[in-house]
């Protein structure tokens, strides 16, 4: 039976479909607010009958996260290989995308069964790495940050792990709308910088699919006392980059990302 679903994140619509014995696609609950009926910008076909015979050679590897995922360039296509100690050295999932990441197939090593729920083709880390690749194609930036909307004003609290993003989200609970406490997307729209919530939260599970014009950026750090100091220019751009997810494997994507960071800090008070 054919199943399909569409999910929109930061004005990018992902169309998910597959042909299989069950339609019980296991989309995480956090995606429920992101379901939509729009025309897909990115089409993903999920396959649950084993991995394709694609050779994953060391010389074709363009990036290794040293964790669970690696990227390869094979015959002009980008291949995501996901591994886990649970399954040994061989990938448990492979995703193959065309040059612009608009079409892809996600292959799963474990076949589905009529009783089982199908694993989410947007399961971590593929969803977030794919978003980084898409944004690097002139679309925007994926930031390690908490995003808050307060009466139509967007506040971005950027920080790496343990810097206080989730704490900031909890402080704002009941005072403003939490877009996400850990992953925010920045995009240019109508001559302004906008920020968008994503499904990929940290410890705080309050998320929103909405976007809001970005008014201020705050770079979080621990200190003995509360305080604010203005950051501008190259330093602000470098701080934003250090708290983002840049496409380190893509020279053109990095050039766009660096330019976009400059553009953001030139348009928004930090």
PLM region descriptions:
Residues 1-156, 161, 171-177, 184-270:
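A noncatalytic interaction/capping subdomain that flanks phosphate/NTP-handling catalytic cores
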Residues 168:
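Hydrophobic positions on the alpha1 helix immediately C-terminal to the Walker A/P-loop
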């Amino acid at each position: 039976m054919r199943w399909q679903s569409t999910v929109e994140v930061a004005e990018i619509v992902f169309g998910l479909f597959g042909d299989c014995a069950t339609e019980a696609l296991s989309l995480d609950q956090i995606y429920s607010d992101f379901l939509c009926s729009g025309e897909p910008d990115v089409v993903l076909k999920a396959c649950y009958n084993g991995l394709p015979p694609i050779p994953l050679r060391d010389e074709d590897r363009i990036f290794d996260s040293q964790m669970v995922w690696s990227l390869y360039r094979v015959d002009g296509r980008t291949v995501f290989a996901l591994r886990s100690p649970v399954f040994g050295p061989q990938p448990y999932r492979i995703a193959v995308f065309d040059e612009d990441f608009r079409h892809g197939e996600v292959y799963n090593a474990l076949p589905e069964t009529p009783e089982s729920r199908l694993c989410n083709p947007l399961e971590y880390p593929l969803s977030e790495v794919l978003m980084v690749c898409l944004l690097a194609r002139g679309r925007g930036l994926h930031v390690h940050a908490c995003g808050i909307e307060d009466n139509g004003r967007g506040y971005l609290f950027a920080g790496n792990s343990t810097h206080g993003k989730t704490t900031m989200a909890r402080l704002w609970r009941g005072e403003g709308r939490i877009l996400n406490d850990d992953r925010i997307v920045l995009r240019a729209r109508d001559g302004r910088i906008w920020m968008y919530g994503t499904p990929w939260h940290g410890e705080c599970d309050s998320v929103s699919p909405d976007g809001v014009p970005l008014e201020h950026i705050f770079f979080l750090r621990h200190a003995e006392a509360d305080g604010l100091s203005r950051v501008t220019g190259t330093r602000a751009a470098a701080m934003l980059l250090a708290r983002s997810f840049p496409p380190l494997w893509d020279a053109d994507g990095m050039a766009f990302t660096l330019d976009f960071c400059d553009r953001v800090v030139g348009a928004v008070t930090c």
